[in-house]
């Protein structure tokens, strides 16, 4: 009987991308990558990274909140810190935008100081376990639908952080349908050609930026990740 070997792949036909919570937390703390403006991809991904995959409880200011799968409860101050906004109202404004896009729903509790949000359709793409237990927020992974990422990227001008995540979500590895992916992960924007090569003009249209800005950001990110 041949020995079993685990193959690591990210194929183009798979409709969602695995994202590690530790990776998102590193991005939150990386002040060298700008998030000004933005399409909302970064903000939505941050919310997903904290969402529960089973029911648990969280106590804030002496009040215990029940948190179901796909939900999380936090203070507005915490939310503003994750989103790196100067004012709390800016963080809440981003929640309003994501809610209008039917990606989340949220309510303000505790006299407006606590936010409880829900990722809509969470169970379609992620685990939703029935039993109650604490959920780790700094380990493990979750799945982000590629279609949702594309919808957000197409909705507005992308920030540097949005671009990092778009490249991550678009990565294909070890798939015979995409050239070069057997050597290492390549960003492939699913245009049906199987060729990952893309022009600055195409990236400019995708991210809502000028070609010069796209070139500058990619060079910056290349230097940052090499360092």
What are these regions (language model features)?
Residues 1-41, 54-71, 126-161, 186-192:
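Positively charged, structured surface patches that bind polyanionic biopolymers
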Residues 17-24, 48, 79-80, 90-96, ...:
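Short linear motifs at secondary-structure transitions and domain/linker junctions
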